[in-house]
A protein has these predicted regions:
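Flexible coil/turn and secondary-structure edge motifs
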Residues: 1-146
Length: 146
């Protein structure tokens, strides 16, 4: 579920978040069945498909709304995320700058942001930024792709 978290404005809009005025991060809330995929595996995918070493930036997108952050739901997720950060910190040339914070209020993004890649595959950002990440995921996690 696409959305926003970690800011200090109630019911933020994409327009306000994207301008950096709410302190929210653009996030994805993942609902998962641990019998199918573990939280640890989700964390591995997280490290695979984005750059956790650049502060407040993902590709050409710059600002705190693009920060690398893991919002955890409970102490077990926090411990697993801490262990994952420690493990993956040896895999990158630069230090991991990903924040690890308790989940504040999650605000669901506008309808047009849900399933954005699926609904807009020809859009420039989707074809040049998202598509290569999806292909990298599919190549690494073939068994998870339906």
């Amino acid at each position: 579920i696409s959305g926003y978290a970690g800011g200090d404005v109630a019911n933020p809009s994409y327009e306000k978040v994207s301008m950096g005025g709410t302190n929210h991060a653009e996030v994805v809330q993942i609902l998962f069945d641990p019998k199918i995929i573990s939280y640890e595996e989700i964390l591995k995918i997280f490290w695979l498909i984005h750059d956790p070493t650049t502060l407040n930036r993902q590709g050409n997108d710059v600002g705190t709304q693009y920060r690398s952050v893991i919002f955890y739901h409970d102490e077990q997720q926090k411990r697993l995320a801490e262990a994952s950060i420690k493990l993956f910190s040896t895999k990158f040339a630069n230090p991991i700058v990903t924040q690890l914070l308790p989940l504040p209020i999650f605000y669901k993004a506008e309808v047009y942001h849900q399933n954005y890649f699926k609904n807009n595959p020809a859009q420039g950002y989707c074809s040049f930024v998202v598509a290569p990440k999806v292909e990298k995921f599919k190549g690494t996690y073939k068994e998870l792709v339906k």
